């Protein structure tokens, strides 16, 4: 982690190498010659942190990118829902602003590594009056709060890398919103 190999293309100021995508390909080919498990870090390093680097505030980038790249924090994506699967526009998990905080209610499914994650990148509906491709917002969710229940989904082989995640009045402070309100699509 200290050498920045977890983030070959990610900026140096956040713990990456700041190299080109072709260098990432070369590294991946070389890494393939060894047993180098990435497992629970793959979603965070491959999807969540790149999204944060593209759309988050500078404060959010500083707070979340470096610990993830150093293997100190695990992330999951909270996107797919029962009844909508990969149709993200069909999301019905709610984020309602009450007393200056976002209150989250709903469910996600097929969430890889949620049972290990400290943080989740959450897509939730913030405006029900808009068409389904609008009114969606991104948030950073603290997965360790009591209002978040993670249930691993056992596969036929006995492993459980996927999960159902339930939110019952989970709380998110406004500074954990990523990008603008309604900019989740």
Where in the sequence are the language-model features?
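Short, intrinsically disordered, charge-balanced linker/junction segments flanking boundaries
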Residues: 1-2, 101, 180-185
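Internal helix-loop-helix
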Residues: 2-72, 112-119
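Short Ser/Thr-interspersed hydrophobic loop/turn segments at strand-loop and sheet-helix junctions
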Residues: 4, 27-32, 123-124, 140-145, ...
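A glycine-rich, basic-preceded beta-loop-alpha segment at the flavin cofactor/substrate interface
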Residues: 23, 144, 151, 156, ...
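Short Gly/Pro-enriched turn/cap motifs at secondary-structure boundaries
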Residues: 41, 83-86, 110-113, 128-130, ...
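A short, Trp-centered hydrophobic/proline-enriched beta-strand micro-motif
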Residues: 71-79, 123
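A generic structural signal for well-ordered coil/turn residues at beta-strand boundaries
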Residues: 73, 89-91, 115-118, 135, ...
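A short core secondary-structure module
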Residues: 91-92, 100-101, 105-151
């Amino acid at each position: 982690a200290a050498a920045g190999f977890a983030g070959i293309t990610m900026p140096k100021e956040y713990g990456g190498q700041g190299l080109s995508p072709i260098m990432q390909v070369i590294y991946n080919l070389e890494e393939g010659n060894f047993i180098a498990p990435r497992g629970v870090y793959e979603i965070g390093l491959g999807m969540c942190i790149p999204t944060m680097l593209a759309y988050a505030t500078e404060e959010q980038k500083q707070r979340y990118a470096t610990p993830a790249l150093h293997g100190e924090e695990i992330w999951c994506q909270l996107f797919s829902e029962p009844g909508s699967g990969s149709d993200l526009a069909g999301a019905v998990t709610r984020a309602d602003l009450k007393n200056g905080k976002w209150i989250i209610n709903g469910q996600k499914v097929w969430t890889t590594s949620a049972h290990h994650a400290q943080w989740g990148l959450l897509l939730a509906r913030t405006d029900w009056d808009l068409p389904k491709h609008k009114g969606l917002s991104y948030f950073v969710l603290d997965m360790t709060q009591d209002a978040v229940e993670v249930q691993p989904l056992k596969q036929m082989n006995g492993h459980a890398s996927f999960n159902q995640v339930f939110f019952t009045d989970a709380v998110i402070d406004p500074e954990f919103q990523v990008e603008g309100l309604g900019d989740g699509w």
